[in-house]
């Protein structure tokens, strides 16, 4: 199957003249639970089943892998239908958000901090990671970002074990979508991770997704927002920013870092 993440377009370089260039593809994806649409997000095609599973899990629509019976495309490549397992208990009305979200806004009125407090516990404090190892992980992510190398316009997320073993890498025009793809893949394969690395900044929704997925360490190449830091402290998540060039800032959870 050809790569659906990028497309070729005609441009004019100044100076230089007409040329062809690669750009990242951005298309809508409708996620349905049964016959009920629950979200439309702008994403980069690819790993759509992972995205749907990760979205439903991190928004607490489903609580576990066994809640999902099947995922398949429905009527078009831009519609995904999730069938729930018999006995799965979900509350679609609990999701207080706008129906549409854009590639730059994952939270956009979705689950609030109060809802997260009801559905999640603070993270366990049983993971220790070598700081030097953590500082090397953004380079490991970047080395696997094939679409970024081509376009320079796509976010990446990667899951690792505490020993630095790479588990998953996903790319998407939306940072929150890349994270959902990683978490959804882990969920569908009943796997777990200790560290999530993201290529850009860290906002509230990225911390929220880590808390729900029980990933205790979040490292980002960019900076976190004030709300991301507040949430990290409340749920005892280790939050690192500006992880590059052999250094970083630790905003919360420094107890998990070994010298």
Predicted regions and their residues:
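Feature captures the catalytic cores and cofactor-binding loops of soluble hydro-lyases/lyases
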Residues: 175-259
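Intrinsically disordered, low-complexity regions enriched in acidic/Ser/Thr/Pro/Gln residues
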Residues: 1-157, 161-162, 166-168, 173
């Amino acid at each position: 199957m050809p790569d659906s993440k990028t497309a070729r377009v005609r441009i004019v370089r100044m100076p230089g003249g007409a040329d062809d260039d690669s750009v990242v593809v951005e298309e809508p994806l409708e996620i349905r639970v049964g016959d009920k649409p629950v979200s439309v997000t702008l994403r980069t095609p690819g790993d759509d089943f992972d995205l749907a599973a990760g979205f439903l899990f991190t928004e607490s629509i489903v609580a576990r892998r066994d809640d999902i019976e099947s995922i398949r495309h429905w009527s078009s490549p831009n519609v995904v239908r999730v069938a729930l397992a018999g006995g799965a208990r979900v509350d679609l009305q609990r999701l207080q958000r706008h129906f549409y979200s854009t590639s730059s806004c994952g939270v956009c009125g979705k689950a609030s901090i109060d809802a997260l407090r009801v559905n999640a516990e603070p993270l366990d404090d049983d993971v220790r990671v070598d700081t030097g190892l953590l500082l090397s992980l953004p380079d490991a992510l970047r080395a696997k970002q094939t679409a970024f190398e081509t376009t320079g316009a796509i976010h990446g997320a990667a899951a690792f074990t505490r020993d630095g073993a790479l588990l998953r890498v996903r790319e998407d025009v939306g940072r929150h979508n890349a994270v959902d793809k990683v978490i959804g893949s882990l969920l569908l394969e009943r796997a777990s991770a200790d560290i999530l690395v993201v290529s850009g900044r860290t906002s509230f929704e990225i911390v929220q997704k880590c808390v729900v997925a029980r990933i205790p360490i979040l490292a980002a190449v960019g900076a976190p927002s004030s709300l991301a830091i507040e949430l990290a402290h409340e749920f005892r998540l280790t939050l690192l920013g500006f992880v590059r060039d052999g250094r970083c800032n630790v905003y919360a959870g420094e107890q998990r870092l070994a010298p």
